[in-house]
């Protein structure tokens, strides 16, 4: 069983379906031809998340029979992905959805009709990209290039139309669209960063302004990219975990007789494969401001709404329903020697910790965006997403840059309690997370063995504050904690001023009592809620 079998005249669909493989319900060749002749959607970033989510929901939309165009994928950084994971398989891939009960769902994705390398050194590919950007039919360009992918610098701005960064290449292609008649298009980031459309806009604007200043392009081009009737940069909220190809999944596919199961590691250290494995749960909420129409991705489950609502969904996720739970688990998980989030969910204290913190303390001030139910969202996080045995997420990864995350993930909830005049005594487990951070900074686990704290720009500075404290030492002076918990840059507010300083100090004393004190303190406060 190989992906390319699907395109052959004597393809045995029954064999695949008998083994649980969901096959495309549309004419793959007809969709490819229509897309080639009248392209509507180009996507930058050929990584795993693209195939697992945007391409997959388009595949679902095509399966309804109500749409007839695919997506053209473009890679601007790691060209080996195109050469090794796309073209040998005629752009087909297998999506393996990892269920929280340990089973998998298998679906062949055939919605990607072309794969191109965005670089002038690949002359044919670049010429095809120019042709696509000149096409009146083009509606949107989307991106999963990570937050760093939107960056630019003076050296690249100075390269003019030969820029090598993704935003520079995009702007050069937009200039072709401008010259073809100032044709409308929407540039839609689907990267997991707040206000993501602004990253695209900032990049395009920086290149366009520089090129106008340098006399490379006419001033009208800058007017074009700033004209919201021509070019828009909507926000979106995307949420789906797509780990690198999983050995367990490879073994399951091999057992089926599916031969395209090898992992590909590129020279740039991208992990890819002809298959992509991802969690079953997914959310894509997009600001509905498109200047030239858009593919009907709502047929595959995408939600379209206002910018305000997209922001509210992001706020719900980041300040209440997902990210705070992650950080609480990561701080205590590291001290309790866990290396997998899913394993932490089998620990009664830790599971109850995030459950009670989320439902009892954070949910009373949750932002309800309307398009997603916060209670359903957090319930899915606790019951499906975090316990998923296929998710290789580690508390050590999530603990990276914790000092930069605490103000948004916990400070915002505390501020809402204060602003609304709510009973601050309802906050017990959130202060326990913040107290746990002081203990985490000592880099000793609950058995008093050293561990390597995750990288953090303020790590050395904050460790120096708690340096006078020793775990297990009786009658020590904890006044140094004030220098930590007054830090508005870390917590979003002065926790002493807010009335939580003494409470947190008391918890820190308990956590520092000695060997086993982290577990004992956690159990005490969680059980009492």
Question: Residue ranges of each PLM-predicted region?
Answer:
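Substrate/ligand-engaging "lid" and interaction regions
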Residues: 1-44, 48-529
